[in-house]
């Protein structure tokens, strides 16, 4: 794979300088603001630097665009008041949706070994939204579900065996597919 040299400074800033600057501050809300973007940024960086070709990057883009579009439409349609009394864009949590899209992408594409830490950080982002009184648990859970479903719909494992639930014509089971 040929490295894309022009991306190194941007990714260094996205992955290290920007999060560390914000995480150094006291505000739990600011931590969630930063980490919601850091997780998908790491996922995109993995597709650009680890993989050959652009299949992973395209899958990442589809998952992210689907998540953000779904969140935008629901926020404009539902008009739910936030727990802090601000009107009217609480449902679903966009921060949780973005973070969980990145975490589910990492897990789905590269496996649970990378996915578990990503999900833990995404769960912390959801916690920051509840703790800062921007969302309730339902808002965060809905955002997380949107992000996870978007990634699961578009993302395929990078290498190895894929296990997919199967249900059709009264038959149920697991389907195993692989890339060699």
List each model region and its residues:
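Interfacial segments of alpha-helical transmembrane regions
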Residues: 46-66
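Hydrophobic core of alpha-helical transmembrane segments in multi-pass integral membrane proteins
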Residues: 39-47
